[in-house]
Amino acid sequence: MKLGIKKVKMHVKKNDMVKVISGNDKGVSGKILRVFPEKNRVIVEGVNMRKRHMRPTQEYPQGAILEREMPIHASNVKKVS
């Protein structure tokens, strides 16, 4: 374990259904796609969408602007059964 980083037990895990209880997306439900226990953050499907600018590649010769989910704090979600 690195200095200054504590491993925190998360109340949710990947593929759990959760509901956002605070923030801009309050009331939205979705599935957890990824968990970051060291930062106490989660990525929820369809929540906290942000635009990412991609530079030109073989896949995107002109470059692209993609919408992706960004992490939110785990305390802002509640598990839904």
Curated annotation (Swiss-Prot):
The keyword Glycoprotein does not apply. GO terms for cellular component: ribonucleoprotein complex; ribosome. It comes from the Bacteria. InterPro entries: KOW, Rib_uL2_dom2, Ribosomal_uL24, Ribosomal_uL24_CS, Ribosomal_uL24_KOW, Translation_prot_SH3-like_sf. Belongs to the universal ribosomal protein uL24 family. One of two assembly initiator proteins, it binds directly to the 5'-end of the 23S rRNA, where it nucleates assembly of the 50S subunit. One of the proteins that surrounds the polypeptide exit tunnel on the outside of the subunit. NCBIfam families: rplX_bact. This is Large ribosomal subunit protein uL24. It comes from Chloroherpeton thalassium (strain ATCC 35110 / GB-78).
